[in-house]
């Protein structure tokens, strides 16, 4: 379940959801609920949260020390995969299993395309290393780990500038002794400078490909997520927020900042999962058992099923295939993650498409007469409408009208507003010009 507690008198809980376009803040406590929406800051996502803390202090007169917990949903993990901005990653595996990551499963997204190429592995073959060791299916050691070989690999990792390592050995889900020893050797040889992800820590389950892929995804996003949550925790304390930081997981629960830094693969659907949990709660309040949760974001749209009052869940998920897909749609086009997820399908909201209205019709190729463009996260959700401005659910959402008096906020064609909803309930806008 979502982290939830009742704040004490003059105590508050701060909830933060960072999306690709907007950051939403909710402050709850002392009998009140306040909200804030602001543009996300992709150069440093934590900046939007810290700015919210400043506004809480300045606008509401609330001391940051009164915030006793921060609950955070984030898209940092999934964006790192989708944008291919993860760490330079290596894989250490049992001799003979170097290519499991590339061979994958039989599934492919297109059945009759002879030109289809599988997605490039997150770890290229030259960075996949084999070690001499072997465990039986019962966990008994059949061949001792060659520690000298591991030390040689550590030297290669240093030469190659590797930032993160996934370790996945055969049958380590039964006996993790060799994986843990490799982790110790890497820590000693590399001085703790390389992020290490052990499959026995992340997914101690049978099935080599799924376990390897999950460990590799964890390693690939590990340094990025670790640095982010550690920086956010430190900077929150510097602003006076002493309460713990809780991070939303893909299954709808929360984990500590330290756990999130060690197991970031659990955060891939952090933000969308929170929305589904909220939808299920609202549906129960309305007496509805079976509903569809739909979340229109600035950069992606998400949908999930709520059945018999509970979000549908899965342990089979795929990320990085252009979209993140639910278990019913997994076809092998992305990177497998076998962890608990709320069963969410996610698609991109579009690219730099233009929409506008001319004298007679709705036009989708843009133009001078009332243009709306999809903007990236750094530009925010600018919406430009012929005759008036309307805040919308996402970058590409557009409401086209003719009479400015019907909506107010009349502006000349070719001008838009980046809307911000403040804690005091007012709206202010920053003028954007074409």
Task: Please report, for each region that a protein language model flagged, where it lies by residue.
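Acidic, glycine-rich loop-and-strand cores that form catalytic or ligand-binding grooves
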Residues: 385
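Polybasic, low-complexity intrinsically disordered segments
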Residues: 395-399, 410-434
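Generic low-complexity, intrinsically disordered sequence content enriched
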Residues: 64, 86, 161, 392, ...
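N-terminally biased helix-coil "hinge/interface" segments that flank
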Residues: 2-357, 366, 373, 379
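Short linear motifs in low-complexity or flexible loops
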Residues: 355-364, 368, 372-382, 392-393, ...
